[in-house]
């Protein structure tokens, strides 16, 4: 925390001096917590839910009212809607099944089995019989059965479960029995039920829409078909409704998603719940994709099907698959990968990978950490001096109760060389999924590598880490280790860099896996010719 009164007093005496000197009060983050190793984290919506919301707003702008249709549909409704075609349609429906409730009695044999477990049944026989009878009649839910048995016999729930497993094996042998109820395979089956209830209650004409999940028993799922999908469906009911309303709604709805020209082509399927010659496929042109796409189907419900539901006015229905529209909008090729990305390979961006390249060793003590910057500045300033040569950086620290004098010597003994090698200022970039070391200038770089490195520098993402930065942190970290181990001197020599570890860098496992799986590279090779001797007294 700032000492505010002292700062104000200093500023009153000499504002310029106070302004400069208080700079040191703003501490910089440590290297592994600084940008770009920290990055903003954003929430992410699902493309299907985005499309659903966009469709909702599009329908509402067109004056439609939102409804939720029944999801569970009796097979009788399918027969009413499809007539003779129903049997073929039901083949694609999922039927709901449930486990029967066995008639479990409390015979002398079962009482004996319970008592063999060390439980006295005689006092609780009537309560136990009542629970078993209640389960059979459906007044007791299955997930409460173990709890109620345990209460009745005044035992733990663990023992109650043991009784259910060992004394009443009938429960383990149950086989699900199908009902006559189906999961909605298309929104139309729900619309007929809704329209039947609204007939005579809601003034005509009315416009309704519903966006919800449907279930279809496909033979197999592939890149364009799932067993569960979302339908964005609407109906218009009124005395003057006909096929032209479908065309107008299709244009009004789809134009809000970037489609322009429209073609209306008679559908060859001819579903029996539509009036003959009204079932129509909608093809729309998308300027960005530059192609015609089938995006919706509409038709006017058959008077035969409507009459069976007590509806005596024409009804136009239009429907489209939400996932289909999402794939078009997001340029996805496989509906499975779009809907369930968690089951497919995830790709990290160059920016994400750049945040995962970190320093391996960094000093813990602030005083030694701060020494690193001095060492970096000294090396960069003198990197090109002619050898034989050496640089010295000397500093005194208090470690515990002991005074430590540290002398860092960077040297090159060989004649007519430079203090440090040509790659010492190379910077780590991430480009097209690769991690590469890019030189400060491209002078002397082979032509076969030059174009790639130039593109990497312009289009890639920098980590902000130079070889000299990471190596200097390695040196000061070893100084700190020497303090702890009471070592008086050590040497460090890094002639040629071949890997990230050579320059005191590491990469998170998730990024490394992607680089390897996608046949990308980590190429940080380069001569640095760093020679260091450290003496501690």
From Swiss-Prot:
It comes from the Archaea. Pfam families: SepRS_C, tRNA-synt_2d. Its EC number is 6.1.1.27. The keyword Aminoacyl-tRNA synthetase applies. Substrate binds at residues 186-188, 231-233, 273-274, 317. GO terms for molecular function: ATP binding; phosphoserine-tRNA(Cys) ligase activity; tRNA binding. SUPFAM superfamilies: Class II aaRS and biotin synthetases. Homotetramer. Interacts with SepCysS. This is O-phosphoserine--tRNA(Cys) ligase. The lineage of its organism: Archaea, Methanobacteriati, Methanobacteriota, Methanomada group, Methanococci. The gene is sepS.
């Amino acid at each position: 925390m700032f000492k505010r009164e002292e700062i104000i007093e200093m500023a009153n005496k000499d504002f310029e001096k106070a302004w400069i000197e208080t700079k040191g009060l703003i501490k910089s983050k440590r290297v592994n917590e600084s940008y770009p190793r920290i990055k903003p984290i954003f929430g992410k919506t699902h493309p299907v839910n985005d499309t659903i919301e966009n469709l909702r707003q599009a329908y509402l702008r067109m004056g439609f009212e939102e409804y939720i249709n029944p999801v569970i549909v009796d097979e009788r409704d399918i027969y009413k809607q499809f007539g003779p075609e129903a049997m073929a349609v039901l083949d694609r429906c999922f039927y709901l099944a449930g486990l029967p409730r066995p008639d479990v009695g409390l015979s002398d044999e079962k009482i004996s089995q319970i008592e063999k477990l060390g439980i006295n049944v005689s006092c609780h026989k009537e309560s136990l019989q009542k629970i078993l009878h209640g389960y059979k009649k459906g007044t007791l839910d299955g997930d409460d059965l173990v709890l109620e048995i345990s209460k009745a016999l005044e035992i733990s729930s663990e023992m109650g479960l043991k009784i259910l497993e060992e004394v009443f094996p009938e429960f383990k042998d149950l086989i699900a029995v199908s009902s006559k109820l189906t999961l909605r395979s298309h929104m139309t089956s729900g619309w007929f039920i809704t329209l039947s209830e609204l007939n005579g209650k809601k003034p005509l004409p009315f416009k309704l829409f519903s966006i919800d999940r449907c279930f279809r028993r496909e033979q197999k799922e592939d890149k364009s078909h799932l067993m569960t999908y979302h339908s964005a469906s609407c109906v218009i009911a009124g005395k003057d409704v006909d096929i032209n309303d479908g065309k107008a709604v299709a244009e009004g709805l789809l134009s809000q998603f970037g489609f322009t020209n429209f073609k209306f082509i008679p559908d060859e399927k001819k579903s029996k719940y539509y009036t003959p010659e009204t079932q129509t496929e909608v093809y729309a042109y998308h300027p960005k994709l530059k192609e015609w796409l089938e995006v919706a189907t509409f038709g006017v419900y058959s008077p035969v099907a409507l009459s069976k539901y007590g509806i005596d006015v024409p009804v136009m229905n239009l429907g489209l698959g939400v996932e289909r529209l999402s794939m078009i909008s997001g340029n996805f090729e496989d509906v499975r990968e779009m809907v369930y990305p968690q089951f497919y390979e995830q790709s990290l961006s160059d920016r994400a990978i750049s945040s995962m390249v970190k320093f391996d060793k960094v000093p813990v003590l602030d005083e030694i950490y701060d020494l690193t910057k001095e060492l970096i500045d000294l090396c960069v300033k003198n990197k090109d001096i002619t050898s034989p040569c050496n640089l010295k950086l000397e500093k005194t620290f208090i470690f515990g109760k002991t005074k430590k004098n540290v002398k860092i010597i960077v040297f090159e003994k060989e004649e007519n060389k430079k203090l440090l090698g040509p790659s010492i200022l190379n910077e780590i970039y991430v480009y097209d999924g690769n991690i590469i070391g890019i030189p400060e200038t491209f002078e002397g770089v082979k032509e076969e590598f030059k174009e790639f490195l130039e593109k990497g520098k312009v289009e890639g993402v920098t980590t902000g880490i130079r070889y000299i930065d990471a190596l200097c942190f390695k040196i000061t970290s070893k100084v700190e280790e020497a303090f702890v181990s009471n070592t008086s001197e050590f040497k460090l020599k890094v002639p040629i860099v071949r890997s990230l570890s050579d320059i005191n860098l590491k990469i998170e496992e998730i990024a490394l896996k992607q680089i390897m799986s996608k046949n990308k590279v980590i190429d940080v090779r380069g001569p640095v010719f760093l020679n260091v001797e450290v003496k501690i007294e």
